[in-house]
Amino acid sequence: MVHHFEPRPIPGDVLDRILESALHAPSGGFSQGLALIVLDDPDQLAWFWKTTGGNDFGDPPPVIVLPIPDKRAYLERYSQPDKGGPDGPFAVESGWPVPYWDLDAAMACMVMLLKAVDEGVGAWFFGIFEGQAEVLETLGVPDGLRPIGVLAFGYKAPGDRMEGSSVTIPRRTFGHLVHRGHWRTD
């Protein structure tokens, strides 16, 4: 992930290809319950950073994207006859053992992160830990919806390098990741 960005803008066609890639991410029942709010105006970006506690991570990106899943699209889709109908288990939120609206939004984020790399654009995913209510209200996000995080896009600044836990904590081994046939504790 890139934390230090050049100030130069991303050409519109490049940014559009990154954003469009989200349309090709998995979508449970083809519910397509995802919206992307794109902020690329310098004044809007300055407001975002001020509202959310600043950009003390490095040089700010020229574009941020808020991926906002909409569970209502999933509940509506899964109340259709081919998905169990209005009385089926997935027609209500409590019927979902995992909130697929968030999962699908996360997969769309991963697709956009990978497309950014393909386009030569640096990227980073982070969370909003301060000011989220004000961000949602100011951007006109409907009640009950919230972003799963924020994607930052821009060209990597010279000298950007991994810092913090990415450098100090060793990556887990393949053997600790993969459990074949059953859960291992060793």
Predicted regions: what they are:
Residues M1-R17:
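A short N-terminal beta-strand-loop micro-motif at the entrance of redox/enzyme domains
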Residues A22-L23, V65, G85-T138:
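Small-aliphatic-rich amphipathic alpha-helix that forms the alpha element of a beta-alpha
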Residues M1-V2, Q80-K83, I148-D186:
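C-terminal helix-cap and adjacent tail motif
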Residues A35, F129, G149:
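Residue-level "edge-of-site" marker
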